[in-house]
Amino acid sequence: MLIIPAIDLKDGACVRLRQGRMEDSTVFSDDPVAMAAKWVDGGCRRLHLVDLNGAFEGQPVNGDVVTAIARRYPNLPIQIGGGIRSLETIEHYVKAGVSYVIIGTKAVKEPEFVAEACRAFPGKVIVGLDAKDGFVATDGWAEVSSVQVIDLAKRFEADGVSAIVYTDIAKDGMMQGCNIPFTAALAAATRIPVIASGGIHNLGDIQALLNAKAPGIIGAITGRAIYEGTLDVAEAQALCDREQR
């Protein structure tokens, strides 16, 4: 299981939100490239970037920052989400050196777009499913749909999706532990690898994820915990490596 540091981009800065609210953000750095360097130096093996402005506007806004990070670390897998709603945007990021693009809102509203993207960019597409009470949320979490997470995840199995990033909105940024039962249930219900996101606070939460013994969970995204110092990236990754030998 990979420990994946999150770099959320808002107006060119590295921030963290609470429960997806743009008005409730904390700026952790005005130099996201330097922040990426910190996590890489700390031993991370993948980075999770989110263009928060892009998620709300429906098109890339902080793309220059994403490109700068990807070019600085050409051998590091980087995944980017937020505002990815066209093949042109995916092509732009892939050409910039990004390993994976995360399709969120568009995957819910137009599931057929995921299949199209997977055909055009095989191995590059991740679906981001953000949920509240088991139902998928869209548009930067501003809207909650009537679509259930597990039902939608199963729909993408035949498309060639590389992974699903599952985020429980109620947990995100709150550092109260992630929704392990549902994350494990999702991993068990689909053949697509799952990356857990939202709520990780400390090493105990990583251990709890490992204890779930869900082989389909391949990663855990962490944000506020590593910025506020309650979780150390290297220590957490070492725990995962030991447990999964």
From Swiss-Prot:
Top-level taxonomic group: Bacteria
Family annotation (SUPFAM superfamilies): Ribulose-phoshate binding barrel (SSF51366)
Principal location: cytoplasm
Enzyme class at the top of the EC tree: isomerase
Active site location: D8, D130
Gene Ontology MF, one: 1-(5-phosphoribosyl)-5-[(5-phosphoribosylamino)methylideneamino]imidazole-4-carboxamide isomerase activity
Sorted UniProt keywords: Amino-acid biosynthesis, Cytoplasm, Histidine biosynthesis, Isomerase
Protein's GO biological process: L-histidine biosynthetic process; L-tryptophan biosynthetic process
Gene Ontology CC: cytoplasm
The protein's Enzyme Commission number: 5.3.1.16
InterPro entries: Aldolase_TIM (IPR013785), His_biosynth (IPR006062), HisA_bact_arch (IPR006063), Isoase_HisA-like (IPR044524), Isoase_HisA-like_bact (IPR023016), RibuloseP-bd_barrel (IPR011060)
A Pfam family of this chain: His_biosynth
Catalytic activity: 1-(5-phospho-beta-D-ribosyl)-5-[(5-phospho-beta-D-ribosylamino)methylideneamino]imidazole-4-carboxamide = 5-[(5-phospho-1-deoxy-D-ribulos-1-ylimino)methylamino]-1-(5-phospho-beta-D-ribosyl)imidazole-4-carboxamide
Subcellular location(s) per record: Cytoplasm
Pathway field: Amino-acid biosynthesis; L-histidine biosynthesis; L-histidine from 5-phospho-alpha-D-ribose 1-diphosphate: step 4/9
Transmembrane segments: none
Record NCBIfam families: 1-(5-phosphoribosyl)-5-[(5-phosphoribosylamino)methylideneamino]imidazole-4-carboxamide isomerase
HAMAP family: HisA
Protein name, UniProt field: 1-(5-phosphoribosyl)-5-[(5-phosphoribosylamino)methylideneamino] imidazole-4-carboxamide isomerase
Organism: Pseudomonas savastanoi pv. phaseolicola (strain 1448A / Race 6) (Pseudomonas syringae pv. phaseolicola (strain 1448A / Race 6))
Gene: hisA
